[in-house]
Design a protein with these regions (language model features):
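Short, catalytically relevant binding-site loops at active-site mouths
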Residues: 31, 55-56, 111-113
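Phosphate-binding active sites in nucleotide-utilizing proteins
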Residues: 1-42, 50
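PAPS-dependent sulfotransferases, especially Golgi type II membrane carbohydrate sulfotransferases
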Residues: 2-22, 61-105, 113-194
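Short N-terminal helix/helix-N-cap motif within the alpha/beta-hydrolase-1
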Residues: 33-36, 59, 116
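Conserved phosphate-donor/acceptor-positioning beta-strand/loop module used by diverse small-molecule
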Residues: 38-62
């Protein structure tokens, strides 16, 4: 389609590379609310739904120093972050129920505790061959031109568990968010405390 051609032309200009076999990963989490239009423009697109305890997601967003945009303005309070999370997940579930989206779920908690099997399953879904170097992601992450994220320093570190289930330390501050997120906590299998 015309929009697809425009997108790839802009990508070629931005990266300085043209054509060839590439795998493009757009990791902006809020793109899940664009799953419908993305599927329409790129019907063969594969989606990776990165899950994490909803309270940890909201706490992490609240604690980040994001550049202010209309979306990031929702992270000034954990309740607003929780509302955005719940609405975004509602829209994702709607798209997933009415469109033939090809997607794979990855739980952060599983990724940090059982990295290799989780990564192998993800690569299989993406149709990417396994290479042992995959387990040394931090060597690639040390190339800052490849990563543009507020958490660059974390991406360059080995996989760690210190952010897993951090939210209970802030239970009082997250009380309002817990109410908003209750159905997502249950729906994604986090109601058992994991």
């Amino acid at each position: 389609t015309h929009l697809r051609q425009i997108y790839f032309a802009a990508l070629d200009r931005e990266t300085g590379e043209a054509g060839g076999e590439k795998i493009l990963v757009d990791k902006l989490p809020l793109n899940l609310v664009q799953a419908g239009p993305i599927h329409r423009i790129f019907p063969d697109a594969k989606f990776v739904l990165s899950l994490r305890h909803p309270c940890d997601v909201c706490l992490s967003c609240f604690m980040q120093d994001f550049a202010i945009t209309s979306a990031m303005a929702n992270f000034f309070s954990v309740e607003d972050a929780a509302t955005l999370y719940a609405r975004a997940m509602d829209l994702w579930r709607h798209y997933a129920s009415v469109l033939p989206l090809e997607y794979h779920e990855v739980r952060y908690e599983d990724l940090v505790s059982e990295t290799e099997p989780v990564v192998r399953a993800l690569l299989e879904f993406l149709g990417v061959d396994w290479h042992d170097a995959v387990m040394d992601h931090s060597s690639q992450a040390r190339r800052p031109e490849l990563i543009n994220t507020p958490s660059y320093h974390q991406v360059a570190e080995p996989i760690y568990q210190r952010s897993r289930l951090r939210w209970p330390n802030y239970g009082d501050q997250l009380a309002g968010a817990l109410e908003i997120l209750a159905s997502d906590i249950d729906r994604f299998g986090y109601s058992d405390g994991s």
